[in-house]
């Protein structure tokens, strides 16, 4: 800001002050001009130095004037506000503390909320047993499994199932027998062996064979007899009945095909 003022004022001063120096050699006659011409360069050098010194002096005066000038007249550009009470507040720290305490008293603090003594439980969950939720899921699931396993044999023994449901109680008894007793008295849940499942499927196959023997099949209803053993082949000629034909893959040779969708 100050540099701009100096550059704006110095050319005007230089032009006004340089005219007397330039007009003096031109005022005398032509003879005087001839004597002045050899000393022209020296005059120009001296005038330039004088102008430089004059510009410095004017710039210093302008800077001093701007510094002494009141800040209110300059406006808001390039001015800084000075807080005159800052020193007093720093000097008297006790007064500031009193003011803060007064402000705190004017706006009292709210008491913190009371601590939660117990957690809120939803009303739908009355007990953990109803929703099968417990803090110790492993023990509770084992206990619940033992109760179910102990209850199933009683139900199967009390009510005799039909031949179609004969495989269900046997499967439950197998699960109970396969459960190994732990030292704590609990029963470990059996895991089906997928690798050696052929050996485990033997009793199930026996049950299915018994069911087939007890209930007449569709082939027998239609007049066809199934040969299950070589003994039946030996006994069939003695009865006088014609020997049964060997089963072939072609359906046309066997005659009318039984309707598998109709269960009489």
Curated annotation (Swiss-Prot):
Key words of the record: Phosphoprotein
Pfam families to which the protein is assigned, alphabetical: DUF4628
Comp. bias regions, Low complexity: 149-171
Coiled coil: none
Modified residues (Phosphoserine): 214-215, 241, 250
UniProt key word Iron-sulfur: no
Ranges of compositional bias, category Basic and acidic residues: 194-212
Family annotation (InterPro entries): DUF4628
Biased composition (Polar residues): 1-18, 73-83, 126-139
Disordered: region residues: 1-47, 68-264
Domain of life: Eukaryota
Keyword Phosphoprotein: yes
This protein's name: Uncharacterized protein C1orf226 homolog
Naturally occurring in which organism (per UniProt): Bos taurus
Taxonomic lineage: Eukaryota, Metazoa, Chordata, Craniata, Vertebrata
């Amino acid at each position: 800001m100050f540099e701009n003022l100096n550059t704006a004022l110095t050319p005007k001063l230089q032009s006004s002050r340089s005219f007397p120096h330039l007009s003096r050699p031109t005022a005398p006659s032509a003879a005087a001009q001839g004597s002045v011409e050899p000393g022209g360069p020296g005059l120009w050098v001296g005038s330039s130095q004088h102008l430089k010194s004059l510009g410095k002096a004017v710039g210093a005066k302008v800077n001093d004037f701007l510094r002494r000038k009141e800040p209110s007249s300059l406006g808001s550009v390039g001015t800084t506000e000075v807080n005159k009470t800052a020193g007093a507040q720093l000097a008297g720290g006790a007064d500031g503390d009193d003011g803060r305490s007064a402000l705190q008293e004017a706006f009292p603090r709210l008491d913190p909320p009371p601590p939660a003594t117990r957690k809120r439980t939803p009303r739908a969950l009355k007990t953990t047993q109803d929703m099968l939720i417990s803090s110790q899921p492993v023990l509770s699931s084992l206990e619940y499994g033992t109760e179910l396993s102990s209850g199933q044999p009683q139900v199967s023994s009390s009510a005799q199932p039909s031949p179609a449901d004969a495989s269900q109680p046997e499967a439950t008894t197998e699960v109970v027998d396969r459960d190994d007793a732990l030292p704590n008295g609990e029963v470990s849940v059996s895991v089906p062996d997928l690798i050696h499942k052929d050996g485990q499927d033997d009793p199930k196959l026996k049950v299915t064979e018994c069911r087939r023997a007890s209930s007449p099949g569709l082939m027998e209803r239609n007049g066809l007899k199934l040969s299950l053993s070589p003994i039946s082949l030996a006994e069939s000629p003695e009865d006088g009945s014609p020997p049964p034909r060997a089963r072939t893959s072609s359906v046309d040779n066997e005659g009318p095909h039984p309707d598998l969708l109709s269960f009489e």
